[in-house]
Every structure is written in structure tokens, then in C-alpha cells.
Amino acid sequence: MAMTKKLYNLMDWAEIEAITYAEEDHPKAVLGAHPVRGGQTLVTTYQPKASEVSVKVKGSRAAVKMELADEDGYFAVLVKNKEPFDYELEITDKEGKEKTIKDPYAYPDSITKRDIQKFNSGINYRVYDMLGSHVMKMNGVSGVRFAVWAPNALRVSVVGDFNGWDGRLHQMERLFDSGIFELFIPEAGEGEKYKYEIKLHSGQTIMKRDPYAFLKEDNDDLAGIVYDLDRVPGSDSSWLDKRDEIQSYEAPLMIYDHGKTDFSKKDAREIAKYAAEYGYTHVTVSGVFDPLYIAGVDPEEIAGFTDALHKADIAVLIKWEPSAFSNDEGGLSVYDGTCIYEDGDGKRAYVPGSERKYFNLGRDGVKNYLLGNAMFLLDVLHFDGLVVSDVAKMLYLDYGKSESGWTPNMYGGNENLDAIDFFRQLSTTIHKYSSDILLISDDDTTFPGITASVDDEGLGFDYKINHGWNRDVLGYMRQEPLGRSNHYNEICFPMIYQYNERFILPVYDTADIWNEMPGDRDEKFGNLRTLISYFIMHPGKKMLTAQSPEGKGKEIQAIQTLIKDVIAFYNKNETLYSKELEPSGFEWINNISARENILVFSRRGNKKDDVFVVVANFANVPHKGYKIGVPRAGRYTEVFSSDAEKYDGFGFVNKNPIFSEASECDGRNDSIRIRVAPLSVSVYKYSPAKATK
């Protein structure tokens, strides 16, 4: 049928060609309903698979057949309505199948210019509410709004189950000439898989995953799955009311480093039971991320997982890796044909020895992505803190690279200035959102000021995991007891820098550590008991992966009992945790007995009489009547010994209180004489009493 002259004159053939070639980034200028002169409205649609299309205006008796303006499937018709009206498209495909749809190009843009300005400035911290797929109603019609950042794309389309993965059908609208593309699709719904088809200026078409998808397939394809975030419940107010106290610097912090989880209810129950049984205050978990949103797990299930642990009064921390992403072709790499998530400088982009790329932290759209993901984990999924991995890789441009394999910063140095700014913005943003969220740095560098405040030119983390402590102490413990004298400085060294940062001390996989300990089976257990006990008594918050050595003997049960008891001892004694981040909470008494391999120090709490004296014997030699200096005159009662018989020790303990003598030792006026078990840690609680002469 020949097109009417009036309709023909309304056709913008250049724009129509852009639509039919799938190269249009402003399809709403061409498609949908547009008022024209004469009190009429031009309705157009692009349906390349259709043989016939009609417009059914709401309230009218009959549908109006559209004319085929372009043989590639561009249909148009003039409707005698001037005011905006509701309509549907009745489509008959070339096989005779019929369907009726709402026109996606009949709906207004819902992302505002203000939203985009905040994104372009790197301060849209809930960017996950803007980008990605969102189940919503538009003008009373249910559907899904899709939005993606692809600033250098020629055209972006949503493809998925709802359109047969045909990129011609749902070409997205570029908003305000920005890099954000949006489209509301009425026939899309929750549970449908989707991706973005991106056409490059070279003419090449690529398929990309949605970086902001709340749910993804748990397979290699990792297609996004439309998910209604309203199904995720809010945080438990009763938990939030007490979280500030639980996460205080003056509260005990005993982290169970659990590792990967499937976030199931069963896993939550098992972790909560284990953590409660052993006395852990926090649990650290990790998931499968792509690259930052957890793949294959329902967000409602993840929030349920965290809430289940909260009901057991256990805080949940998640390991978060904002340093890099996979270089696979369907992910963030060269997302719109250009380097928008990575640096265009290959020396800065590539992670040495891996198929990964570093995020370009100098770009606001990237910072928004990372900061938004952090807020999503904390606000939507109810995590209580982030353990940030690979901080060192982010802070240093030359990390793991050859001398010629990196590009210096603008001042010629190796510090990543963008990473420093990013971490400061991250810590400021998170702590402004909630002051009781924990931000923990997992890095092994001497970069200064990790836990210093941003106002003091620090990065603003709450804690830093002290891998140096783990390395030095385990290096010492791996030596034969008789040979430890030559390595005595290694066990003392961590206290030199203990208060440079707010440290968390890690002990990973006690089963592996047991295998590394010297000596026969009994000595291995003695060393392990000593290590765990020293770890708890040493200043610094704690992180433990408590996996007992293999077997079911009494030694295994004894180690498990020791771990439970020593954690309980830590949790109930403010002397050990209230001032463990302050120099005033610790004092060396004897750190010069290399020949005996003995250390003696005091731990102090907030009250004057909150004093413990800790004696650690790293040799397999016992001592009777061993003289040690004490902080003040009084009574000293042994309240813990790793050599107790219930821990499969020798029971070489001090059962009765010991009164100090006015006899100089270790540079102090008062002293006590004690029994010191081999390979042991013992703790003496001070109470006021007159010293004996």
C-alpha cells in the first residue's frame, strides 16, 4: 500500500536508516508517539520481524493499521489524537503469530539530569539504584527499566529472553548526550536473562554483561537476571541498635575467617553455631563476584544469611576486591570498545602474571561503580564491614612489575595517587553513611597512615591486617626450640611498629601451622598451644582460621578446648581488649632473655588495677622459681596457662596466688617467683596487696 503524502513528508529518512541499521542512540526522537500539525499524532515503530502492525488506542473501538514506511520493518501511522494517549501495538509476525505489546518508546526517561551529574562527579553513591535492571511501574504499567554506562558506544540495545536476543528491537536512549543509556521495556519481567548489545563506531557489535546486575547466572555465561530488589528486607533494627557497641575500638574483636560460602540458610546456621561455640564476635566470608556483584546467589538469600548471623549476635564482614577485573571479552574489559573501566595505558592496566586488569581509579564513572558496590553490600545486603583485598596492588604503580613495566605518577613516584584519593573517598563515604561500619585493609606493605584519619592525611581505614606479625612470629615458631635464641628479635620485632596502625593479627589455618611446627607430635601440639595463646595475649585485634590438625585423639580435642577457652578469656577480660590499640595498654617487662627464649610483658585495661602479667616460654625447658619483675606490689594469681592438663599439657602451673617481694628484677622494684612450663603461655592477674619483705 502506497504511503500517504502527508505521512511520507513526516518521515526523517536519515534517522529511520539509523534505526533500521541499529545505529541510533536517540531512538525516542524517531520511534513512539509524536504530536504533529493538524491535531494529530505520528506513531512509529520498528518491528523487523512483523508483517503487519496496528495501533490500538485505549478507549477506541478498533485498531488503526500502520503503514510499512520502510521495508526493513519501520511502520508508521497518523492517529487523530493531539493529547498524549495510552496505546498498544498489535503485531503479526511473518509466520502469522500475533501478540500485543506496550510500546517501550512511549514512556518518558526516568533517570534525571541531577542523577547523571552526580554520577559524572563520582558522588552518586547509590548508583545501583540508577544503573542496571530495575523492576518498576511507569505510568501504571509494570516492566523493567534498563540502564548502562557506555559513553563511547555508537548504539546500545538490551537483548534477552523477552526479545529473542535481537539487538534491533530495543535500542536504548542516550540521556542528555551523556554516556548513560536507558530504556523501559513493559514486556520484560523478573527472572528473565539479559545482556547489552553494543555497536562500536567501527561497525563491530559486541555482547556485554551488565556490571550492575543484582543477580547473574551461575555459569560461564553470567548473563544478568532481572531481579526485584524490593524483595530484600531491610536491616534488623535490633541488631543495628547494638552494632555500634560491638564494633567499637574498645570492644573485643575476634574474627573467624571462614572463607567462601554459598550464603544458604544451612551455611548460615552452621557458621553461626560454630562461631558462637568458639566465641567469635565476627565472621569473614567471601563469594563469587563478577566482578563485584555476587554471581549466582539471590540477594534476598544473602541478606537472609547476614541477618541469621546477626540474630546470633555475630557481625558479618565480606572480603571485597576492588582492585581488578577479569579480561574476558564479555566483561568490563574494553566495555564500549574503549577503555572506560581500565586505564588506556597498558602498563597501568594489566595485572602482572594474570588475565586481569586494574580499575582506572582516576575516572569518576569507575569510582562510582566501586563506591556504589560497597554501599550495596553494606546497605542492601546488610554486611557490617568490608575486608578490602589487594590494597598494596592498588597503592603502588610498580607492584609486582619490572623496572620498565610501569608508568610513574605525575611527580615521578610509584604511588598511585588516584588509589589514595579513592580510599579516602571510600572511607569518608562509608563512615558518613554509618560510623559503626568496619573498613579493614588487607595488605602487606609499609604504606604509612592506612588507619590514620583522612583529616590527618591518612586513608581512613578502621583496621589493617598485620601480615608482618604473622610472618615474623611464625618464622620464629618454625625454628627448633633450642635454635630460637638466634631468632629472638623476630618475636620481639612486631611490637616496634605495633601502634603505627590499628592492627588485626592474623593466624591462618592452624592445621597447616601444626604441620610446620618442629619436634615430635607432643612438641608440635605444645608449640601450637603456645602460638595460639601468645596470639590472643598480644596487643591487636584478632583473626583466626581455626582448623584443627587431622585426627580425633585427645590432643585434637584439647586444642579445640584451648581455642574456645582462650577466646572466652579474651572476650571477658577488658584488660586484653579495651586498650589493645593504645601504647598505654602494653609494657615490656623482659624482652632480653634470648638464651631462655622467654618473654614477659604486662597488659593494662582502663582501670588502675586492670593489670595482667603475661609470661611466654618458647623453649621446651621448664623453670622453677623463675624470677620476674612486676609492675607494682601486690598479689598475682595465675588465671590462665596453656600447659593446663585439660589442654593436654603437663599441668606445670601455679595453683596458689603469689605475693610480690620488694626485690628488684627486670628494672622493677618488685618481683615474683613462678613455675614456668615448657612451651607455654601463662597469665597472672594483679590485685592490690602489700608486698612481702
Kindly give the residue locations of the regions a language model identified.
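An acidic- and aromatic-residue-enriched active-site/binding cleft used to recognize and process polar
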Residues: 151-153, 161-163, 199-201, 288-290, ...
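Hydrophobic residues within beta-strands of alpha/beta enzymes
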Residues: 53, 156, 283, 384-386, ...
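Substrate-binding/active-site clefts of carbohydrate-active enzymes
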Residues: 213-225, 229-232, 236-415
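Short glycine-biased active-site loop of nucleotidyltransferases that positions the nucleotide triphosphate
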Residues: 67, 173, 327-334, 339-341, ...
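Carbohydrate-interacting/catalytic domains
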Residues: 1-256, 261-264, 269-279, 525, ...
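Conserved alpha/beta catalytic core and glycan-binding cleft of carbohydrate-active enzymes
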Residues: 382-384, 402-548, 571-628, 632-643, ...
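Alpha-helical packing segments of well-folded alpha/beta enzyme cores
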Residues: 271, 301, 305, 366-377, ...
